[in-house]
Amino acid sequence: MEIHNLKMIVLYVEYDKTKYKDTLSILMNSLEKISCKKQVIVINNDNNSQSEKKSEYYVLSGTNRNWEFSGWQQGYDYAKSQFDFDVVLFANDSCMNHGKRELISHKLSNDLLLKIYNESRFYGNINLIPDEYGDCFFEEKNVKEWIRTDAFIIPKTIMDKIQKIDYSDTYNIYDIIPNNITREAFINNSYFSAGLTNFLLDWFEKLWHSRFDPFENIKLFQNKTKAIINEKLLSYYIRKHNFKTLNHLRL
């Protein structure tokens, strides 16, 4: 396929326009260098917007129920009902923050997009939990590898197999992290392997740029854990169907 015949859907979830006020304009400018057919859908998760069609993109009113993942799922379901497309670019409003800009702004090109499509490859930032944590399982699924979901591209051939982006309806976060959970109860939970449990605690308390005490903010603990599970299950199902990946850090 030639690049001008390729059709791409862009699903952009925004929540905090004050903190990330320039992200959408930077993203739109970055897309101008791509010669394929593009349709941009903005999912506004701030619960204070209406669905509408603007000159450059559609706007859908999101719920923020499961952060960007429910927004992407809503946008993808809408796109499937309205458009024909070959690849999907997923992004949230932090995709140009914390040194992340190069994934889209610097490395995305016509040649790379054709490679993603022709070889049915996932493109994004793929990370591996350090070996020091040992095995990392969620409900018997090996989730040692995980995808940073500020921005990534998936061909429709992969989406047709994995079927969804938001996996939060496949488990109950309140069973995993009840509102009254203690540190001891979480350490002894039956959902995560010991390695994954230890990694999550280290991530929240030491490694994440917005580190916090999870047992002092249970709501954030629940929501952030849901987001991490979604990232890990996305990677798990891509591997399960034997699709190859392109890690932008190695290009």
Language-model regions, residue ranges each:
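ER/Golgi luminal nucleotide-sugar-dependent glycosyltransferases, focusing on the catalytic module
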Residues: M1-L251
